[in-house]
Amino acid sequence: MHFTGRTWRPPYESASFIIQATSGCTYNKCNFCSLYKDEPFKMAPMEEFEADLAELKHYQPNARRIFLTGANPFAMSYERLKFLALTVRDYLIKCQTIAMFASIRDIRDKEVWQLKKLRAMGINGLSIGTESGDDETLALANKGYKIGRASC
């Protein structure tokens, strides 16, 4: 398996298999977070992603849930996410959930039809770091948006 930088996942993903899709954070300005401060955002090379899927298939061919690492892999383009989801499906035919971190900005940057398609392809486990529903707290945390942007 290929991992660079820090690898972190929420506790409720502890049973999920981890595959690196990105490293670093696209925003990297939150006042409370130092996890990726010295790590620029970059996408994992597709060759490494596929090699990791092949390794996972070898040891866990019936994997039903995977977690893509990085601060916000959902920042990748729709086309890249679609390709990753289809690649996961090629290697792990029983995989039902592709989970990852996403920011409000990442979700808002995508069209509704794209979100629906990605969900249908198995990207249906987004962990969204809203941190608070209070604009003053969001400003103190330097999240870069107000709560109105987090609602539909």
Where are these regions (language model features)?
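Short microdomains enriched in Cys/His and/or Lys/Arg
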Residues: 44-61
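Canonical Radical SAM [4Fe-4S] cluster-binding loop centered on the CxxxCxxC motif
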Residues: 4-48
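Conserved SAM/AdoMet-binding glycine-rich loop
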Residues: 57-147
